[in-house]
Amino acid sequence: MKPDIHPDYTTVTVSCSCGNTFETRSTIGKDFHVEVCSACHPFYTGKQKIVDTAGRVDKFRRKYGRG
């Protein structure tokens, strides 16, 4: 590798809007903020919202007279 052409790979602190913080390594060089992390994302917490698709289908059928 050529010397002095690669960015510094430093430890940065990532803070989430839910209050969770963790450290990782990055070339960004400064601490940064994210809106969603694994501690608060619905996929990882198991609190997923179920979309009412049956209600939408019924509304469509009533509106267009199908079924």
From Swiss-Prot:
Q: Which domain of life is it from?
A: Bacteria
**Note accompanying the cofactor annotation:** Binds 1 zinc ion per subunit.
Taken from the UniProt entry, a GO cellular component term is:
ribosome
PROSITE patterns per UniProt? RIBOSOMAL_L31
**Which cofactors are required for activity?**
Zn(2+)
Residues where Zn(2+) binds: C16, C18, C37, C40
For this protein, the record's InterPro entries field holds: Ribosomal_bL28/bL31-like_sf (IPR034704), Ribosomal_bL31 (IPR002150), Ribosomal_bL31_A (IPR027491), Ribosomal_bL31_sf (IPR042105)
Q: Which GO terms describe its molecular function?
A: metal ion binding; rRNA binding; structural constituent of ribosome
Q: Report any Pfam family annotated for this entry.
A: Ribosomal_L31
Write out the entry's keywords from A to Z.
Metal-binding, Ribonucleoprotein, Ribosomal protein, RNA-binding, rRNA-binding, Zinc
- One GO term (biological process): translation
Does the record bear Cytoplasm in its keywords? Answer: no
Family listed? Belongs to the bacterial ribosomal protein bL31 family. Type A subfamily.
The record ties this protein, via NCBIfam families, to: L31 (TIGR00105), PRK00019.1 (NF000612), PRK00528.1 (NF001809)
Q: How does it assemble?
A: Part of the 50S ribosomal subunit.
**Role according to the record:** Binds the 23S rRNA.
Q: What is this protein called?
A: Large ribosomal subunit protein bL31
Q: What is the lineage of its organism?
A: Bacteria, Pseudomonadati, Pseudomonadota, Gammaproteobacteria, Methylococcales
